[in-house]
């Protein structure tokens, strides 16, 4: 994972200390997310690993708690990863990763594509 994609510990929310293996199901990405991944040179597999392992990125405390509960009750799981601007080449922003409640699919997308 590029160093820029490591969220500072104070901003990262989730169950990083537990050994979580969230089933991802079929993994897909929206066209907009793929453009951002390319423009920022992101390691999408690394981000999916973080999501799968319970590192929810920069979600709110409320959303982090909801994700932790979703692991127990089978609800949807949302991670958010802030993107740095890449030297004027691409603006910063945010990338979401959502795993469906039934764990059949995980989607990488931009918040505007939700």
Outline where the language-model segments fall.
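Short, Lys/Arg-enriched N-terminal segments with co-localized hydrophobic residues
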Residues: 1-4
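Short, compact, well-ordered microdomains
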Residues: 77-114
